[in-house]
Regions:
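Basic, Lys/Arg- and aromatic-enriched nucleic-acid-binding interface segment
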Residues: 1-16, 20-22, 32-36, 49, ...
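Short, basic (Lys/Arg/His-rich) helix/loop patches that form interaction surfaces
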Residues: 1-2, 12, 90, 105-169
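A cross-family signal for key residues in well-ordered alpha-helices
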Residues: 7, 101, 166
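Short, flexible loop/turn elements at secondary-structure junctions
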Residues: 10-12, 45, 96, 129
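A generic "binding-loop/recognition-motif" signal
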Residues: 15, 96, 160
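Flexible loop/turn segments at secondary-structure boundaries
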Residues: 15, 48-49, 99, 133, ...
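Conserved tyrosine-mediated DNA breakage-rejoining catalytic core shared by Y-recombinases
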Residues: 22-109
Length: 169
């Protein structure tokens, strides 16, 4: 999951919530020799206070995921982005499209294996159970990777900044 998330952050300059909010219907692979794969950013996944989610009366909330922590005051939600400008089409480099194709194949095999035990929300980045990742889980995976490989400490969001800098150079 971290490998896919890092590739999307760097290749497509996506925010963590945009990455976690991607569903497979947002991904469009090149067909018939066309070399243009792309994705549609139209949702974001974030963790919010349950009371705050209720207070919005469902405005812009597309889905509230079942809580995995008993007595938690927080919920993961899939919602529309804050602004209309955040909704956009992003072209996928071939290498990133290939990574996503391989990831999708593995995910479909897992869905086949687990059957009804897989909670299928059609998320691109889903845990082995089908449940969504939250940003804290991705941050933790990144920190573990950084420390295991003795790399400089960076934030996940810095991948987005590096991506933009690289594209401007």
């Amino acid at each position: 999951a971290l490998y896919v998330a890092m590739n999307l952050a760097f290749a497509c300059s996506l925010r963590i919530g945009e990455i976690l909010g991607l569903t497979w219907d947002d991904i469009h692979f090149a067909e018939n020799g066309d070399d243009t794969s792309w994705l549609q950013v139209s949702k974001t996944l974030l963790e919010v206070n349950k009371q705050a989610a209720v207070a919005t009366e469902g405005r812009d909330i597309l889905m509230v995921f079942p809580s995995t922590k008993p007595n938690s005051s927080m919920s993961l939600i899939l919602k529309k982005p804050k602004t209309k400008n955040s909704i956009r089409k992003v072209y996928l480099p071939r290498t990133t499209a290939d990574i996503l194709k391989e990831w999708h194949t593995r995910q479909l095999e897992l869905i086949d294996l687990l059957g009804a035990d897989y909670q299928n929300y059609n998320l691109v980045l889903a845990q082995n159970s089908g449940k969504p990742y939250d940003s804290h889980q991705i941050y933790k995976l990144l920190k573990t990777f950084i420390h295991a490989h003795h790399l400089p400490d960076v934030t996940f969001h810095s991948l987005r900044h590096s991506s933009v800098t690289y594209k401007l150079a």
